[in-house]
Amino acid sequence: MIFKPQSFLKAIVLSMTITFAFNMSAPIASAYPIFAQQNYENPREANGRIVCANCHLAQKPVELEVPQAVLPDTVFEAIIQIPYDTQVKQVLANGKKGDLNVGMVLILPEGFELAPADRIPEEMKKKVGNLYYQPYSPDKKNILVVGPVPGKQYSEMVVPLLSPDPATNKNVSYLKYPIYVGGNRGRGQVYPDGSKSNNTVYNSPVSGTITEILKLEGKKGGYTISITKADGVVLTEKIPGGPEVIVKEGQAIIADQPLTNNPNVGGFGQKDVEVVLQNPVRIQGLLAFFACILLAQILLVVKKKQFEKVQLAEMNF
């Protein structure tokens, strides 16, 4: 099914439902890209970085394929690939292990937008599947988001797009335009308020000695680690369920030394490509030029044959 303007609310509700299913007790930060929509007017910062990187700290690859050139008012497809090892498991919000989910944001040039359902070929609809692509906001139809969705099923996404027509949209010209994509797999390491999730490494805030490691009971688990400083002050660091403690009682540590491993197996990546909005008149002119060249070549060959016949006749005479 493909998103329609009148289905905007339905798409949001569905996306939030999927988010809840994959992150049952997680704060909104893990519900990418919804939290970006709520906190940023534009997902691409002035320096070119896509805001998803603020919470997904690990760098991973992402691929984007589009045609080299498209004609105006034409439906074409963009293929996004978010590769990862589907055998690995991530730490969920409840501290348990589960499959990774993926999400992406596609930033199109002004005038480009999601293709209407009635203009998408049946073959392309099959490639899209049941993904709902929704605008980043009501006034930014050229920015599309989706996710989180199951990574095993949607590590490759096909987005049906509609190119603008400069004849009807005076803000668009026949030029080369950039397209940006950001794609992530797995949960983030930081929440919007700056606090850590349970999908990251925890470091010691001070230097001292580990005096106690207490395992917490409950559904989410976790630990409390007591660190005694040189002046005798005891500081307690709480570790949520998910990361594994890698220090021992009696161990001397320094500030910023890791107390846990880094459980994160996901990451975020971004890429940009270019697409040319091609003027049909230019193509027609180019074809006409090639036709003239071909005709000239044919005439030259014919003329050469005639000349050779005349020479041969004169020699025989």
From Swiss-Prot:
The chain crosses the membrane at residues 280-302. Keywords: Chloroplast, Electron transport, Heme, Iron, Membrane, Metal-binding, Photosynthesis, Plastid, Signal, Thylakoid, Transmembrane, Transmembrane helix, Transport. Binds 1 heme group covalently. It is found in: Plastid, Chloroplast thylakoid membrane. GO terms for cellular component: chloroplast thylakoid membrane. InterPro entries: Cyt-f_TM (IPR024058), Cyt_f (IPR002325), Cyt_f_lg_dom (IPR024094), Cyt_f_lg_dom_sf (IPR036826), Rudment_hybrid_motif (IPR011054). Residues 1-31 form the signal peptide. Gene3D superfamilies: 2.40.50.100, Cytochrome f large domain, Single helix bin. Heme binds at residues 32, 52, 55-56. GO terms for biological process: photosynthesis. The keyword rRNA-binding does not apply. It is a single-pass membrane protein. Component of the cytochrome b6-f complex, which mediates electron transfer between photosystem II (PSII) and photosystem I (PSI), cyclic electron flow around PSI, and state transitions. Belongs to the cytochrome f family. This is Cytochrome f. It comes from Chlamydomonas subcaudata.
